[in-house]
Swiss-Prot record:
HMWC (high-molecular-weight cytochrome c precursor), ORF2, ORF3, ORF4, ORF5, ORF6 in the HMC operon form a transmembrane protein complex that allows electron flow from the periplasmic hydrogenase to the cytoplasmic enzymes that catalyze reduction of sulfates. ORF6 is a redox protein. This is Protein DVU_0531. SUPFAM superfamilies: alpha-helical ferredoxin. InterPro entries: 4Fe4S_Fe-S-bd (IPR017896), 4Fe4S_Fe_S_CS (IPR017900), Cys_rich_dom (IPR004017), Helical_ferredxn (IPR009051), HmcF (IPR054810). Residues 54-84, 112-140 form the 4Fe-4S ferredoxin-type domain. Gene3D superfamilies: Alpha-helical ferredoxin. It comes from the Bacteria. It comes from Nitratidesulfovibrio vulgaris (strain ATCC 29579 / DSM 644 / CCUG 34227 / NCIMB 8303 / VKM B-1760 / Hildenborough). One of its GO terms (cellular component) is cytoplasm. Keywords: 4Fe-4S, Cytoplasm, Electron transport, Iron, Iron-sulfur, Metal-binding, Repeat, Transport. It is found in: Cytoplasm. The keyword Acetylation does not apply. NCBIfam families: sulf_resp_HmcF.
């Protein structure tokens, strides 16, 4: 079968097609069609010839098969050190083989490659940190995902996710009207406790333009309110854009590079329109990577810089605490043992470990590091889209064991997880293994312990 009704090589560009795909519960028909989806070998090889640059070719050639990447991979470790889980083997037996065969691979090969690309690697790039040749396995697996996506071999949930970005400009069906109404609603809800609090929309020349994850207005609107409360306490001159507010990119997980470009260009257009002094992104790892690290290159910015200076939320919080914009009541600091999850995308891959430790020094009396930690920490177990793929849930749950054991070794009762994927993985970890922990973003914790300036307190009756 050349292409199916649901599983095909075409991106999802219309609301009608998106709703039809969503109606295929669990991707039942989608995956059935995938088993018969023919590989367009000529198009695959033409794609490789056009996009596979010297760096990727060199990495594939210089791998010495030394095995240094093996123990660095948490999936290798939790799968009984199966040699087929060694990162070098995983990439050589998939991407390397596609290139060696000049694209002449069949459906069964692509089905296998899809499973490896999305259930045996989260693109955390911990292995790349230990490679003596500096091979960036995360980049190579991302490239493999792009090739698979172009041929229609992509998990159902991620085909939907990239379609959401194409159709709605967000990873979920949140329209501009929905978003602006959520901002108004959340501001109104806070008036009694936080008089004067606003969520300003489309204010030009603000000091901060805040962007976030579509899950927040869709499922966790209180997160939008919490961000507003902390900006309010800090006295920030800030705004959100009515368009270009969504900074995440499920398209990046899917390997839909055209949708990645579309998504980040919406955010950058908002920056150009509103001209803020800087941008602050929410507590999300992959969103930061998509908008602040990879984004400039997708959007054609050759210098690799965003249109305005960009801060991850942990950078802004650390600055606000350091400068006294937000002050912590010592009596309200976290007293119980607490540990911290390091998001791969902004700790290992963007060097922000000092910011998160600085924050913990202000808010925790008994902070306990995981072992290993900082840039050496392990992936939460659900990154790179792994959390959301039902087909690979069994493998994902097994992958959570490494993080489970790290947390247990600290004796912590609370895990601070300033990243949506990490937050989800640790929530699921507790549901699966029942180890008796709680987990939290930074925002609600800091609000509970912040000293509220007198002029921001509600008048006593």
């Amino acid at each position: 079968m050349p292409e199916g009704k649901f599983c095909n090589r075409k991106p999802v560009n219309t609301e009608e097609d998106l709703k039809a795909l969503l109606g295929d519960k669990g991707g039942a028909q989608y995956y059935k069609e995938m088993e018969e989806l023919e590989v367009d070998q000529e198009a695959l090889w033409a794609n490789i010839e056009k996009t596979c640059q010297s760096r990727t070719k060199t990495w594939l050639e210089i791998c010495a098969h030394c095995g240094m990447c093996a123990d660095s991979c948490f999936l290798y470790r939790v799968n009984d050190r199966d040699p087929k889980q060694v990162p070098a083997y995983k990439i050589q037996s998939t991407l390397g083989e596609i290139i060696r065969r000049k694209g002449k691979v069949d459906t069964q090969f692509m089905l296998h490659a899809m499973e490896v690309a999305w259930s045996q690697c989260t693109c955390c790039n911990r292995c790349g940190q230990y490679c003596p040749h500096g091979i960036d396995m995360g980049v190579m697996f991302s490239y493999l995902r792009g090739l698979l996506y172009s041929q229609g071999f992509v998990p159902w949930e991620l085909k939907i996710g990239s379609g959401m970005h194409r159709v709605y400009g967000a990873q979920m069906d949140v329209t501009t009207e929905d978003w602006v109404e959520t901002c108004e609603w959340m501001a109104e809800e806070q008036q009694e406790e936080w008089p004067g609090l606003e969520i300003p929309v489309d204010v030009e020349n603000a000091d901060i333009m805040y962007v976030l994850n579509a899950r927040e207005p869709k499922h966790y609107p209180e997160d939008v309110a919490e961000a507003a409360i902390l900006f309010h306490i800090a006295g920030e001159n800030w705004t959100v854009p009515s368009e270009g507010w969504e900074q995440t990119s499920l398209a990046m997980f899917a390997g839909d590079w055209a949708a990645c470009k579309m998504q980040v260009e919406r955010v950058y257009a908002a920056i150009e329109r509103l001209k803020p002094k800087c941008v602050v992104g929410t507590e999300c790892g992959h969103a930061h990577r998509a908008s602040a690290i990879e984004g400039p290159y997708w959007a054609g910015y050759e210098d690799g810089k965003t249109p305005a200076p960009w801060l991850h939320y942990v950078e802004w919080v650390a600055m606000a605490l350091r400068t006294g914009k937000i002050k912590i009541d010592p009596e309200k600091r976290i007293k119980e043992p607490v540990t911290l999850q390091d998001s791969c995308n902004y700790i290992r891959n963007h060097g922000l470990a000092k910011c998160t430790r600085e924050i913990m020094s202000y808010i925790a009396d008994d902070f306990r590091e995981m072992t290993p930690n900082r840039e050496h920490n392990y992936c939460c177990g659900g990154g790179g889209g792994f959390n959301g793929i039902g087909k690979f849930r069994k493998q994902r749950n097994k992958a959570l064991q490494t993080k489970r054991d790290q947390i247990l070794a600290t004796g912590a009762k609370l895990v601070v997880a300033p990243c949506h994927n990490c937050w989800d993985a640790i929530r699921d970890l507790e549901e699966e293994y029942r180890i008796g922990i709680r987990w939290s973003f930074l925002k609600p914790l800091i609000i509970k312990m912040a000293i509220i300036p007198e002029h921001l307190r509600p008048e006593e009756e």
